[in-house]
Amino acid sequence: MSEWQIERLSRSHDRSAFSCGKPSLDEFIRRFVTQYEKRNLGRTFVAVRQGETLIGGYYTLASSSVSFEHLPEESARKLPKHPVPVVLIARLAVDASIQGQKLGEKLLIDALSRCLDLAEQLGVHAVEVDAIDDQARSFYLKYGFVSLRDDLRHLFLPVNTIRDALDSSRFQ
């Protein structure tokens, strides 16, 4: 079995058979991602095996901001009282046929690494996620995300925490 590669979504990727078990995530990659990309609302990256076009998983990144009032107290103490720039992991999904094989972790680490690169180019304080359900929330909590004050599934991970984790190979 060949190793997964993560690359920018293109027309050559086969999205038709993707099914993660969450209808909104399945429908996004099959029907809406092209318009999302054309309108510059986000960028989608897919996991494929070398030489294949079938998508095993994907994630989408977009720019966003988090309201100061929603920040965890520890973060809020250190920041000005206005919205904080973040990168949003808008979606992250793995095909049901390969769930439990660590592809979600590989996608998340790739997304966080990409977010760190973005933070070197422009002001980004953290990565934000709106977990689709409690199972997804538990997944993100394992990687150090913390809940924001507005919703337990609205999660946040500071760029400095990501940098430290990637530098120490804690995520690898």
What are these model-predicted stretches?
Residues 40-66, 70:
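Conserved beta-hairpin
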Residues 90-100:
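A short, internal acetyl-CoA/4′-phosphopantetheine-binding micro-motif in the GNAT/acyltransferase core
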Residues 116, 122-123, 130-150:
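Conserved active-site alpha-helix within GNAT-family acetyltransferase domains
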Residues 58-91:
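Conserved acyl-donor/pantetheine-binding loop and adjacent beta-alpha core of acyl/acetyltransferases
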Residues 1-22:
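Conserved N-terminal entry element of GNAT/NAT acetyltransferase domains
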Residues 52-57, 65, 82, 98, ...:
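Short Lys/Arg-rich amphipathic alpha-helical segments
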Residues 108, 133-136, 152-159:
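Short glycine/proline-centered loop/turn elements that form peptide/ligand docking sites
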Residues 100-114:
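Conserved acetyl-CoA-binding loop-helix of GNAT-fold acetyltransferases
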